[in-house]
């Protein structure tokens, strides 16, 4: 619980519980430094973001939350409120891998609402995941990205990581209670394939300990892992298999024979230590593939996207190309200030921390693949997806771990003994997108022509996948859904077409409003013309009649009463109710064209209550350690 603040003590005094003197209050504040420093949501509010596109700023919060007071351990988060609500309120927590790689990769290069056009200009991400879900990016473990901890206090094991993450969530929900009832999905990629199942298990254990109504059980509704490092025992041997399938190495060649020797050594190490997460001898297979497939220009395969090449020995460490803009942007002083970065953190943002990676060896942790069966059997849906051009955490290893895993009374994607769930062809807007496979609460999606970072390559397709998994229903907000089909069948509308700054539904509504307005203006114009013609006719009649009268009564001054009454009636009609034809257009009809969900704020509590500045005008809602990368 949050510590008592002066304002809340005042409300207690009003209720007659206690009468505290000013002297006692001052002493309390003096000897309770944490009381004076307790933060509120307003302290995390992002009031501006350098380089953001024109228009209202998306609602966001960012900053540090302490998870280890003894060692000054703090986790950094960046939260975006969703742009629209479909049928339920959802929050997606996103984690990148490493270990020790910042989730700002996900925020600015994959699923976040913005991408960098250059190192000082942001543009909207066409396919961002914040369309129907709040996004919470967290730099973890401590020491990663903008997160920090005292030197020599980095953590080592997966259970330490998950315990600190639960502490983070407890404190985060205290700051932002309006989101605590959301459906929660934990998503990420690469080495986050180890983190996510451990966090999911810790959430379940935390929920099971709740005995009263003083705490809220968190609604964990699913986990999503892309190109995950989940089962090293399957992933290490898949390097050579993948290299054969993609034509990186020719089977039967002298190189292949040499690599098979390394493969044999690796398999013996796995047999001796089947639960090891990091095996040095197995990493040698990947290193040899990269080193011995260089071209004449010393260009090696990009281990994250084998369609590309990179200078040796980087072999993908310079990828993706957006990195050249992300790093200088996140190191800008004005950006650091805007994101409420603790000024005591002296070091600037780094994509991946070697210190975190080398310390987090998980030597005493079981690989997360062993947690998946229990999670599935407890009712937690799991989505595993892979880009087919990734080498380091390739789809061959993911498919092998699924085939070997037993859960809910079957092995792999068995639907009955010896019968396997079919692979369904997926097309997106008329183009082959990949395959879907499902059995007993587990979904697998293979993306065609995608790298280690699928949302980086295919943002809209990945959003479509997410919407389907979360069962987003856009029927109540209208709009034309994306043409996404499984085996040629267009399933329920779960994803909208892409638009840089809104949903296609909203754009369509705006176009419909504009069309209605023009029709109304045309009607009003026609009506006004008729009124003018009538008025001119009446006025002409009045002039003609007046002149006749003046000729008959030239000796008498008389104000023409008929003239006044006709003009008054004419002006009254102009200023009073519109004529029948113009009245057919009612501006309230325009309001009805807006679906209630499109322009509605997410939560009444969260709109401006967290911005306490009286001058604030809230915006309208409107080895390898790498990007999300794995260090096998």
Curated annotation (Swiss-Prot):
Keyword terms, alphabetized: Apoptosis, Carboxypeptidase, Glycoprotein, Golgi apparatus, Hydrolase, Membrane, Protease, Signal, Transmembrane, Transmembrane helix
PROSITE patterns in the cross-refs: CARBOXYPEPT_SER_SER
Region (Disordered): 480-509, 574-632
Protein name: Pheromone-processing carboxypeptidase kex1
Lumenal face of the membrane: 39-523
UniProt membrane topology term: Single-pass type I membrane protein
InterPro entries referenced in this protein's UniProt entry, alphabetically: AB_hydrolase_fold, Peptidase_S10, Ser_caboxypep_ser_AS
Regions that span the bilayer: 524-544
Gene3D superfamilies found in the cross-reference section: alpha/beta hydrolase
GO molecular function: serine-type carboxypeptidase activity
GO biological process, one term: proteolysis
Location of this chain's protein in the cell: Golgi apparatus, trans-Golgi network membrane
Enzyme class: hydrolase
Lineage, broadest ranks: Eukaryota, Fungi, Dikarya, Ascomycota, Pezizomycotina
Catalytic activity reported: Preferential release of a C-terminal arginine or lysine residue
UniProt-listed Enzyme Commission number(s): 3.4.16.6
Biased composition range(s): Polar residues: 492-506
Principal subcellular localisation of the protein: Golgi
